[in-house]
Curated annotation (Swiss-Prot):
InterPro entries: AAA+_ATPase (IPR003593), ABC_transp_ATP-bind (IPR050319), ABC_transporter-like_ATP-bd (IPR003439), ABC_transporter-like_CS (IPR017871), Oligopep_ABC_C (IPR013563), P-loop_NTPase (IPR027417). It is found in: Cell inner membrane. It is a peripheral membrane protein. Belongs to the ABC transporter superfamily. Its EC number is 7.4.2.-. One of its GO terms (cellular component) is plasma membrane. Residues 7-250 form the ABC transporter domain. This is Putative peptide import ATP-binding protein BAB2_0818. It holds the Pfam family ABC_tran. GO terms for molecular function: ATP binding; ATP hydrolysis activity. The lineage of its organism: Bacteria, Pseudomonadati, Pseudomonadota, Alphaproteobacteria, Hyphomicrobiales. Probably part of an ABC transporter complex that could be involved in peptide import. Probably responsible for energy coupling to the transport system. The keyword Nucleotidyltransferase does not apply.
Length: 317
């Protein structure tokens, strides 16, 4: 990318201290997202995907690292400055049932951020809420109803509308369809894709569904135990994965075409505890291609082809 990225993350870390150990949930994570780009973040449960999303918006405080958003270091902003910044950075939560207050009307939920930011008159805020509902294809009378009156898919549309009311530049979509029925997931994914293209949104799309990520994302970041394993364009990553972990993930995607199916690569064991990560490469204990040097060398992200990076000391595997 030649232009200055909208979001630039360098050396992001999030550690939790217990009585007996330090939990390294994220460790030295760095990536960029260009304006108007959709970047997917994939990995197994417990890899740190949600922690990255929440750290970027400072919904949780990072332990270390720099988070540059349009030239401002988010990690160093005061509470007042961060409140102003949040009108440009919004979050779509995974659970559409838990993320909406049962005591508030949908209109009150949609206008809450506008009230906090002091944007517009009451009539102008109401108009923004109505516009957001229209953008997510919900009827106008939605505004006077309560969350329990809607299905899971409708609630997630309301969550998307809430993020849109502040007209943000950047959205973190944290597994926005994983809690929905399969029949509804495609509708919500298509809606997000349409909104992103129509409004020119920049998005970090967190998911464990690799088929959805391929459909909606321009580039993909593969995360394992709090470290980045691979970064590439969606097209290149799915066609020519360079890291053994990425290959294992992609081999698990079901295909209806018998001729297109690949041999399933089963990873041995479970993901290690962040309290006691393996030395060297954190993936080595489950990697089918590991060698002795993997136990002593921490692999750094390196460019193996134009725009394609992997964290692996081995070549041509």
């Amino acid at each position: 990318m030649t232009e200055t990225p909208l979001l630039s993350v360098r050396g992001l870390a999030k550690h939790y201290q217990t009585r007996s150990a330090t939990l390294k949930i994220l460790d030295n994570v760095s990536f960029d997202i260009a304006r108007g780009e959709v970047v997917g973040l994939v990995g197994e449960s417990g890899s740190g995907k949600t922690t990255i999303g929440r750290s970027v918006l400072r919904l949780i405080e990072p332990t270390a690292g720099q988070i540059m958003f349009d030239g401002a270091d988010v990690a160093t902003l005061s509470a007042r400055e961060m409140r102003r910044q949040r009108r440009r950075m919004q979050y779509i939560f995974q659970d559409p049932f838990a993320s909406l207050s049962p005591r508030m009307t949908i209109g009150e939920i949609l206008m809450e951020g506008l009230n906090i930011q002091g944007i517009g008159t009451k009539a102008e805020r109401l108009e923004r809420a109505r516009k957001a509902l229209e953008q997510v294809e919900l009827p106008p009378d939605t505004i006077n109803r309560y969350a329990h009156e809607f299905s899971g898919g409708q609630r997630q549309r309301i969550g998307i509308a809430r993020a849109l009311t502040l007209e943000p530049d950047f959205i973190v979509a944290d597994e926005p369809v994983s809690a929905l029925d399969v029949s509804i997931q495609a509708q919500v994914v298509n809606l997000l894709r349409d909104l992103q293209q129509r409004l020119g949104l920049t998005m970090l799309f967190i998911s464990h569904d690799l088929a959805v990520v391929e459909y909606i994302c321009d580039r993909v970041i593969v995360l394992y135990l709090g470290r980045i394993m691979e970064i590439a364009s969606s097209e290149d990553l799915y066609a020519r994965p360079q890291h053994p972990y990425t290959r294992a993930l992609l081999s698990a995607i079901p295909s209806p075409d018998p001729d297109a199916r690949t041999e399933r690569q089963i990873l041995r064991g479970d993901i290690p505890s962040p309290a006691n990560p393996p030395s060297g490469c954190v993936f080595r204990t489950r990697c089918p291609m590991a060698i002795d040097a993997c136990a002593t060398t921490v692999p750094q992200l390196r460019e193996v082809r134009p725009g394609h990076f992997k964290a692996c000391i081995r070549d041509n595997i």
